[in-house]
């Protein structure tokens, strides 16, 4: 819960432009090394561990609250907090631990908010949170950076550099998130196994090639775009989509009826453009408009000129040619490292339903998947060599359109035959 308080502080105080990066990693992985480089490059560092110590220094209201709750025997002779003495009292039972959290964590959250409020509107805020993964805090940040070192190397560092007993080192590592959990949360994975300084160039490249353009895109309302060319299916697309969905869910709150990974990247084994497609289902377009600013702040600005899908002919099964019910809102990711299209459609309208149907049809039918792959390959060839992005997309979509007009009817026939439901 304390991590949520810290993160809510970040979101309540920020101006709507700054980029928020969550930095974490297992004990002994060296995330402080990465934080140092990011700070040298201009990042605004918010270190949760440092703040947790700061808010209970001598003379602070935090320390006074601790002594009022746990007694003056938690103080050292010089008046500072005796942390082992506090731990002996606060971690002996669940009720005491809750009392400790209720004192310290809101103070850390408030101090975090102060730091963020003092940052420039175009800042890159780096929030160092040791238990970010364990606290499921990824959606609160535009990006999560994981610093990784394998467990044995971390044990060696903890025992050799910090003098920690091996049993304690292994116990602390075992109590933290697994590597699989960290990989699922990581937008950026930094392997810090090498010698000191070996990751510095990687961190600088991250800053220059992704963080700075990402922040600028958010501030200027620019969507990251890629040319419509097919790439080999990437198993990582599914985890990437899950992280995007989590961020969108946080931004939309109860305005979203459901949020789904759609399109070719949602079909395992299907080659596709390296762009994640997500559909947010809403009750009405007024709801879509009401969350436009939250989505921009979350890193998904709106594209004003893409507010409809092309109606499909009414062949008697699922078809509806009325343009009004093919309206939508379109947002896109500002992250140059993970382009994404975000389609906001109304629950039950034909474009909303077909997006789900088409995905499931492709997943279920190998022959259709192969057929569609060929169509996309030819569409990419039609767009190849066209340097203007809008023109390339138009050529790509026009090449697919005739097939889709027929596929719409075929998909709905499959839906009736299989009793498909969204």
Tell where the protein language model's regions lie, with residue ranges.
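Helical scaffold of the NTase/Pol beta-like nucleotidyltransferase catalytic core
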Residues: 18-21, 110, 199, 204-260
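Active-site nucleotide-donor binding segment shared across nucleotidyl transfer reactions
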Residues: 25, 129-133, 245-290
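Walker A/P-loop
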Residues: 32
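ATP-dependent small-molecule kinase phosphotransfer cores
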Residues: 53-124
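Small-molecule kinase domains that catalyze NTP-dependent phosphoryl transfer to phosphate-bearing small molecules
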Residues: 111-112, 139-140, 160-211
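ATP-dependent NMP and nucleoside kinases share a basic, alpha-helical "lid"
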Residues: 113-118, 124-160
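Metal-dependent nucleotidyltransferase catalytic core
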Residues: 156, 160-172, 207, 214, ...
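Catalytic cores of NTP-dependent nucleotidyl/adenyl transfer enzymes across multiple folds
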Residues: 341-422
């Amino acid at each position: 819960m304390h991590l949520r308080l810290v993160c809510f502080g970040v979101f309540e105080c920020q101006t709507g432009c700054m980029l928020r990066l969550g930095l974490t990693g297992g004990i002994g992985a060296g995330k402080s090394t990465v934080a140092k480089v990011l700070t040298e490059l201009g990042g605004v560092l918010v270190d949760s561990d440092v703040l947790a110590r700061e808010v209970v220094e001598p003379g602070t209201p935090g320390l006074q609250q601790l002594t009022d709750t746990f007694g003056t025997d938690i103080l050292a002779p010089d008046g500072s907090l005796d942390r082992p003495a506090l731990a002996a009292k606060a971690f002996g039972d669940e009720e005491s631990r809750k009392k400790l959290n209720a004192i310290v964590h809101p103070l850390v959250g408030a101090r975090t908010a102060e730091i963020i409020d003092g940052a420039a509107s175009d800042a890159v805020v780096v929030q160092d949170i040791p238990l970010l993964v364990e606290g499921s805090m990824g959606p609160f940040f535009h990006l999560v950076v994981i610093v990784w070192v394998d467990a044995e190397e971390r044990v060696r560092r903890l025992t050799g550099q910090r003098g920690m007993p091996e049993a304690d080192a292994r116990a602390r590592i075992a109590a933290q998130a697994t590597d699989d959990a960290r990989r699922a949360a990581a937008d950026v994975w930094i392997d810090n196994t090498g010698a000191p300084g070996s990751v510095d160039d990687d961190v600088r490249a991250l800053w220059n090639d992704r963080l700075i353009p990402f922040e600028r895109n958010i501030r200027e309302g620019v969507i990251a775009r890629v040319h419509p060319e097919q790439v080999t299916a990437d198993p990582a697309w599914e985890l990437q989509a899950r992280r995007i969905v989590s961020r969108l869910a946080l931004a939309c709150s109860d305005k979203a009826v459901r949020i789904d990974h759609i399109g070719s990247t949602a079909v395992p084994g299907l080659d596709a453009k390296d762009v994640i497609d997500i559909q947010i289902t809403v009750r009405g377009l007024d709801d879509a408009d009401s969350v436009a600013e939250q989505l921009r702040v979350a890193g998904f600005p709106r594209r004003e000129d893409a507010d409809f899908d092309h109606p499909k002919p009414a062949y008697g099964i699922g078809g509806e040619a009325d343009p009004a019910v093919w309206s939508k809102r379109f947002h896109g990711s500002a992250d140059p490292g993970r382009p994404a299209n975000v389609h906001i459609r109304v629950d039950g309208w034909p474009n909303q339903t077909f997006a789900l149907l088409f995905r499931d049809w492709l997943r279920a039918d190998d022959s259709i998947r192969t057929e569609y792959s060929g169509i996309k390959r030819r569409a990419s060839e039609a767009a190849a060599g066209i340097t203007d992005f809008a023109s390339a997309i138009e050529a790509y979509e026009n090449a697919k359109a005739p097939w889709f007009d027929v596929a719409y009817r075929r998909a709905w026939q499959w839906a009736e035959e299989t009793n498909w439901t969204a």
